[in-house]
Amino acid sequence: MSVLFFDIGATLADVSVAADGSMTFDPRPRVVEVLDSFAQVRKGIISNPGPGATARENAAAALEAAFGGRFADEALVHWGAKDSRAIFDGAVTSAGTESDDCVFVGEDPDERAFAREAGMRTAAHPVFTLAAVEGRPVHWARIEVPEDRNLAELEAVANLDEVVPVHVASDRLVLAMATARGVRAVEQSGFTADLRGQVEETSAFLVRDDRPVSVPEAFAQAPAVSRATAEATMRAAAAFAFVSAELAESRPTASSLGPAPGGVYIAAAAGLPVENVHIPGTRPGHIERLLPDPALLSRPGQARAEGFVAAFAPGAPSQETVDAVRAAVTPSAIRAHVARISGADPLVEGDPLTVRSRDASSADNERVVDALAGRFQELGLAVRRHAFTWRGHRLSNVEAELAVGASDGVVLVTAHLDSTGAEGEFFDSAGRPRPYDPVVDPAPGADDDGSGTAAVMATAECLSSMVASGRSPARSVRFVLFNAEEQGLVGSKAYARAAAATGDDIAGVLQMDMIAGFRGGTRTMEIHAGSVVPGPVAGGSDALADLVAQAGAAVAPDFTVQQLTGAADPAVGRSDHASFHERGWAAVAVSENFFDDTRPATGTRQYHRPGDTLLDIDHDTDYAASVARTVAVAALTLAGL
């Protein structure tokens, strides 16, 4: 009989770590029913809670609290790193059976690859555990929704069978993982499915390609739908050809899963660095890592987004709030935070250590997380870390909340804490060009997104000061700093997925991504509300953008505010707000004048380069403070202050 081993983070549960190190495991959707369907089968754990006995004890306590009694055999519980086959070999030995009788269930493709090396069968999601036991393959599938069907009907079918969505391209197309059994259920319900390659040890990415496409003259007189299909097919082929050429020396390689919104879906084998590929002529943020999530079909935030529109009442923010923000969110405050996390000043006062890089692969990333979490704690906020794994790295998003009793939802003020220097020029000891090495190369990220992170911290300090003076918001306010944004929105996708699974009531998300770059000319800030997700999320995000624009008029009257909306917004899917759009919540991203769209860009010229420092000529903390004040006033107004 088979022995089942499960990873915890993102597979069985979403993991959060409190300030005292205690852990909470929130079971992922459909997980408990899967475990209970194998009640008579031996089950174990292969997971890495972090170094030290205390971390393992905390993880064991959280496991029992979340899944009481379902993992009773301690001999089958294995804590430790999953960066080689060693821990998987140990699991097979503990099972006392053949390796082929052992199944490892884990979302991370690299870990599944190590499990395969140890002779284990694997499943990319708990829903496919039985398929792994029975030796049935799981495929990538493009599911088409006909005009007489909708996503809610597809969800009803998928949640009862072996189907898990990873991306909703539109109301008519969903990319999913599915077995042949799941596909039969889908097709019997009136949907169609186009099977692509097997999932095995691959993960899915959306790679956008903004280069112009010339549709053949033969389509000149064709219906608009036919021309659009031809253009999408050609764009997908061009994008995949470029990615394949860039990764030609890698083994194994990637495969195309067909056209995606603005580009191509790609299945990348374990270890393949798709996120490092940059297509010339393509706007920034063109790669998304896609995660399996049943909530992509239900979009639980839609009701809240719809209510946001109905409840939104235009009006100027209170003068008291404006004054408080002006006093706390200052150029000097922004500069001080940026200096600490970009290496211009020591990270922590009294400690000479400075930050070289906040890249997700850099050792400094965790140090910055520690420092930011510590500052939030000093402000009296409830702090926890949302833990996740990316390419063998244990990473954390940082969350800090001022909770309000009987709150009508929570307002999120967000940015991403990581950085990259991938667009820089690097040379080896002989002076020959070499690729960016995220482990050792500098990535100060003063603008991207040190400026947004600084603005979040300054807003938290402002709220703390307001509360100390006797004011209290009507809604809870939560500050979230996402990790691994530069790897395809990985941290925010993991966070938003967890929020959807736990029924988080999010009133609105205000993301700041690059707010300090200014070359001169007209002071302009961009408010990005656009999304390809249809339904209430579009209206809710537009209304949230209106609120930000009104705040800008109050605290940054010398700025031109550029509101971008709809599918034509150049930031669609390219910053962390998109992870919330996917699940139906109203969200905006506010930035410097970064995109060349209706007016020439005046933002930083050091994007993703080691020159993105506090001393860069384009880095303007006065400019950043004005944008930060705008978002702070909007957020605090939404919170009822």
Task: Map each language-model feature to its residues.
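Asp-based phosphoryl-transfer active-site loop
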Residues: 2-18
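Short, acidic loop-to-helix structural element flanking the phosphoryl-transfer center
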Residues: 18-45, 53-57, 85-89
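Substrate-recognition "cap/lid" segment bordering the active-site pocket of phosphatases
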Residues: 48-102
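N-terminal hydrophobic or amphipathic helices/low-complexity stretches enriched
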Residues: 297-362
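A non-catalytic alpha/beta surface segment that caps or lines the substrate-entry region
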Residues: 336, 343-403, 560-562
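Catalytic-core environment of secreted peptidases
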Residues: 337-351, 375, 379, 396-480, ...
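Metal-dependent peptidase/peptidase-like ectodomains
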Residues: 484-587
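Active-site-adjacent mobile loop/cap segments within catalytic or ligand-binding domains
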Residues: 511-534, 567-641
